[in-house]
Amino acid sequence: MASRTEHADLSDLSGDSGFKRIATISLAALGVVFGDIGTSPLYAIRECFHGDYSIPVSQQNVLGVLSLIFWALVLIVSLKYLTFIMKADNEGEGGILALTALIVAHSKKNRHERWFLVGIGLFGASLLYGDGMITPAISVLSAVEGLQIIAPAFKDLVIPITVIILTGLFLYQHNGTARVGALFGPVILLWFAVIGVLGLVEIVRYPEILRAVLPWYGFSFLLNNHLQGFMVLGAVFLSVTGAEALYADMGHFGKTPIRFTWILFVLPALLLNYFGQGALLLFAPQESHHPFYGLVPSWAMIPMVILATSATIIASQALITGVFSLTQQAIQLGYLPRITVKHTSAGHRGQIYVPGANWALMYATIGLVIGFGSSSKLAAAYGVAVTATMLISTILFYYVARDIWRWNKLATNLLVSFFFVIDLAFFGASATKLFHGAWFPLVIGLVLFTLMLTWKQGRSLLLQQIKDRTLTVEEFVQSLALQQPQRVTGQAVYLTANPDVIPIALLHNLRHNKILHSEVALFHFSLERVPRVPNSKKVEIKKYGDGLCRVVARYGFMEYPSIRQVFSLAQEKGLHFRLETTSFFLSREKIVTGLKSKMGLWRKKLFALMVRNALSATSYYDMPSGQVIEIGMQVQI
């Protein structure tokens, strides 16, 4: 997801200035939010009539498929996401992790139900990583495949060119998108304008194709084609992949610009192109192998391949950035260990680069291109992860509507059941492709889900063991009053994962060195289940006397903890520690397995491996490395 754009509640803007502002943000949103769903015309119709589960080209089948696509776009994107799910924002932020955090923050449910909601939310987020691997592969590959339509001799060059483009895209990530990001909106604007016009030309030739807006044709298609018609739903669903991005990017652009852009521009352009492809198939059924490029005049094929490739690169970029943002949120919410997160823009804190995620995506995406060999085969692997995520979003939305908003139970049950049946139908159709590649994103999702649960549970066990081996802050203060250790002049900061207990590093230092600094601050970073915490509420200081105090720094899951910022805010509240002269003490735990618990031995070993490879607190919290002392200890879990 792209960098956060400053926005207020745009729904109350009026007049020329308000319209211009919405238009400006809408143009920016075009290049980020709508790239994925906007490039689906490259392969969605083709897979219905030329894929592994395709059906013959006939008037009734074409009208039926178009009717299903039309109502999928209307019901899933326009109604479900833009009208209802977008209401479930976490202080303006969207996305499945933000939705999960919102439910947990307001939930009064028992422990098991809370874990169920957290579990399905994490699994939904994990599935998006599989989607992030497939989308760049299928999008860029389907665009480059236009070369073999220009000249069959180019067929052997499609895979190498796709690999080169994807390699360049991932290698460029460390530079950020600040310099080239301004081009994204205009390029995608041109893309939608061109595909809309191409479709309109064919619709004018065969206006009867517009009858497909009647839902009867969709029902008739499913009734007449039985199981085969149901399986084609998996290809129909390709037209709405990317709908989750509209919700996930809500925090960057606001609800109004996204809705405005969808209704007035994106949806009409998509429908024109889909219906144009349908009209073409009625005239030229032989074009079913690539109806999108069949709309393009021969003289415009090369420019169109270039434009399509550019659009798919931008769509891929948006998804890659989304994976970076999702990873950062998961770290902040405590579901993944600390890893390197680099900021690529001084002016926009939201523009980040996560090297580990970038290389994993790169190798997986290129491997998919080489392994599957064509966008048609990749389409079989696409969709099941997205449909599962949509199902989970519907379930989570139900709990928000029922428990947080207190909507009428009957109305809520009817509404959510309606969406759930639609999602379940698409999921079932996509799941039929399980042995044709759909297993891949599910396996990736399960791996990430296991890592997230292991880290969360392992941290809980670790903190409990540390708590059992140390003193509470109050007990430590009482011990100082009874027996004062030797004090040395200076300021020391000890990081603590639990604000109510003394960190092991302090006790070890006191036990072995027999000294304590004259001024000691216990620093605790509290990661809240809201996107951002205002600076006025970010730092809380409690002084215990005898030179001891506790500083609690609160950060949201869209923020980046910084010890330098905490020092600055703490000084404003009367804590006069100097960053350049303060010594920082950290605990470095070595995990030893052995204790009996609900966590299996293999997961304990996995957790120990994750701890060893986690980024140090020194780097993550931006501490001055020359002033950090790490004290090691063994902890058995």
Curated annotation (Swiss-Prot):
Main subcellular localization, coarse class?
membrane
GO function term, MF aspect, one: symporter activity
GO cellular component term of the entry, any: plasma membrane
Tell me which UniProt keywords the record has, alphabetically: Cell inner membrane, Cell membrane, Ion transport, Membrane, Potassium, Potassium transport, Symport, Transmembrane, Transmembrane helix, Transport
Query: Which InterPro entries does its entry note?
Result: K+_transporter, K_trans_C, K_trans_N, Kup
UniProt cross-references to Pfam families, sorted A to Z: K_trans (PF02705), K_trans_C (PF22776)
**Looking at the keywords, is Transmembrane present?**
yes
Q: Which reaction does it catalyse?
A: K(+)(in) + H(+)(in) = K(+)(out) + H(+)(out)
* Cell compartment(s), UniProt: Cell inner membrane
Q: Which ranges does the record mark as transmembrane?
A: 25-45, 62-82, 115-135, 149-169, 180-200, 227-247, 263-283, 295-315, 352-372, 378-398, 410-430, 434-454
Give the way it sits in the membrane: Multi-pass membrane protein
**Matching HAMAP family:** Kup
Q: Which family does it belong to?
A: Belongs to the HAK/KUP transporter (TC 2.A.72) family.
Role noted for this protein: Transport of potassium into the cell. Likely operates as a K(+):H(+) symporter.
Q: What is this protein called?
A: Probable potassium transport system protein Kup
Instruction: Tell me which species this is from.
Output: Chlorobium phaeobacteroides (strain DSM 266 / SMG 266 / 2430)
